Regions:
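Post-signal peptide N-terminal segment of mature Sec-exported envelope proteins
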Residues: 29-51
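Bacterial Sec signal peptide processing site at the extreme N-terminus
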Residues: 16-35
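Surface-exposed short loop/turn segments
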Residues: 25, 53-65, 71-72, 76, ...
């Protein structure tokens, strides 16, 4: 019986951790994300996707945390590739819904934002060109 409590407690903690925004790595804080094209002189690296949330924990995560986490995930992935500039191509919020009926045969339901996905093109730019100090 004691192991059931441990399992339940562990599951609860894991679920709550899923409600927090993905943390941005210290170096990734310097990655600039903009809808503007990369300046001339920047080198294209790859496309990156940042995501936060899913159908299970997304409904328990605030929209602000979903948005912040997806942006942090994008920055972390771009930084891991050596990029310091991301041209944001798309930003989408995923909605999960349900349909239900009522006692009078009416149709009802609900929907909630459960994830956010950002897609962008990652570039490495001369730091001075994008407003970063040369040591960045």
């Amino acid at each position: 019986m004691h192991s059931y409590y441990k399992f339940g407690y562990s599951f609860l903690l894991a679920s709550l951790v899923g409600c927090a925004a993905i943390v941005v790595n210290p170096q990734a804080r310097k990655v600039i994300v903009s809808p503007n094209h990369a300046p001339k002189g920047c080198l294209y690296i790859d496309q990156v996707v940042g995501n936060q949330g899913n159908f299970f924990v997304g409904g328990y995560t605030s929209n602000a945390h979903l948005e912040e986490g997806a942006m942090n995930d994008l920055r972390n992935k771009a930084n891991a590739l050596g990029a310091n500039y991301v041209q944001l191509i798309s930003n989408r919020a995923g909605i999960t819904g349900s349909m239900g009926g009522s006692y009078d045969n009416g149709v009802g339901g609900s929907s909630t934002q459960t994830n956010v996905t950002n897609v962008g093109n990652a570039y490495h730019c001369p730091p001075k060109l994008i407003g970063l100090s040369p040591s960045a």
